[in-house]
Amino acid sequence: MSQKTPSPPGELKRDIRALKGASKVARIPVKVEPTTERQRKPHWIRAKAPIGPEVLRLKGLLREHRLHTVCEEASCPNLGECFGHGTATFLIMGNICTRRCPFCDVAHGRPDPLDAEEPMHLAQAIGAMGLRHVVVTSVDRDDLRDGGAAHFTHCIQAIRTQSPQTRIEVLVPDFRGRMDRALEALTAGPPDIFNHNLETVPRLYKAVRPGADYLWSLRLLARFKEDHPTVPTKSGLMLGLGEELAEVEQVMKDLRDHGCDMLTLGQYLQPSLYHLPVRRFVTPEEFDGLGDKAREMGFTHVASGPMVRSSYHADRQAAGESVV
């Protein structure tokens, strides 16, 4: 049977745009009122423009291997910097999510079937880039019996075969209702770092993470740690959505109580006027203070700063270097 030719990038982008923004957040429990204009950012929020020869080279390589990155699909403000250094966070299992989180710019809809060749294409691209540390994440796939955990494992195994020296970090969804099956699938090829983001404080979950559960996410981190005690676990929070600093500190404590080793704290930025607004811009000094408290609590690796994202300079995070 002949293989279906992928849609040209322009056509794919037009289709995806219809699944973002207003249409995505139209049916969530807590209604998001569109803002009328972009908020002015403080001077400490600066991002590199996504242009330059290395950015174009990496985009070409990704299209050649029919791969997506969360950098592009989620409109990450650090895309220009990361692509400019030849690094990317790979987004597997397509670029259409089964969830409607109003902080995220990834499209919502009915996902395509899994691509059985994606692990091979992913491993080839990573080999071509010569990456020493790679981050692999995914959309939520509530349509799959294991939430896509086996596909994660296939990708990890393919990368290890192609690039045995590459350190593999996975940023996984919550595998809602499928934790046992997902964790069992991951035992066949555990990563070097297991990351699952809590994203925000429990009080804001209904508005920020509709369909997710704070305690479930904590249990996922703890259960993986029980199964793989030598593999570091990691989580992250976005700040500026209306949380109190005391609530953030309590989440940090909850993470430590559930065996989490690594932590990222960054500023939430509104992807579009239809997404959740920024309630406030947390100062660099506040990020520094939270980072100090996290280290006092026993986190082995902490990245805390306005432009920090879960996978921002993940190689340096894993090495224990300061990332802000």
Curated annotation (Swiss-Prot):
Cofactor note: Binds 2 [4Fe-4S] clusters per subunit. One cluster is coordinated with 3 cysteines and an exchangeable S-adenosyl-L-methionine.
PROSITE patterns: RADICAL_SAM
Gene Ontology cellular component annotations, sorted alphabetically: cytoplasm
Residue ranges of domain Radical SAM core in the record: 83-300
Enzymatic reactions: [[Fe-S] cluster scaffold protein carrying a second [4Fe-4S](2+) cluster] + N(6)-octanoyl-L-lysyl-[protein] + 2 oxidized [2Fe-2S]-[ferredoxin] + 2 S-adenosyl-L-methionine + 4 H(+) = [[Fe-S] cluster scaffold protein] + N(6)-[(R)-dihydrolipoyl]-L-lysyl-[protein] + 4 Fe(3+) + 2 hydrogen sulfide + 2 5'-deoxyadenosine + 2 L-methionine + 2 reduced [2Fe-2S]-[ferredoxin]
Family: Belongs to the radical SAM superfamily. Lipoyl synthase family.
Cofactor(s) the protein requires to work: [4Fe-4S] cluster
Keyword terms: 4Fe-4S, Cytoplasm, Iron, Iron-sulfur, Metal-binding, S-adenosyl-L-methionine, Transferase
Binding site for [4Fe-4S] cluster 2: 97, 101, 104
Positions with a binding annotation for [4Fe-4S] cluster 1: 71, 76, 82, 311
EC numbers on record: 2.8.1.8
Primary location class: cytoplasm
A Pfam family it matches: Radical_SAM
Biological or metabolic pathway of the protein: Protein modification; protein lipoylation via endogenous pathway; protein N(6)-(lipoyl)lysine from octanoyl-[acyl-carrier-protein]: step 2/2
Subcellular location field: Cytoplasm
UniProt protein name: Lipoyl synthase
Molecular function GO terms recorded: 4 iron, 4 sulfur cluster binding; lipoate synthase activity; metal ion binding
Enzyme class: transferase
Keyword Nuclease: no
PANTHER family membership: LIPOYL SYNTHASE (PTHR10949), LIPOYL SYNTHASE, MITOCHONDRIAL (PTHR10949:SF0)
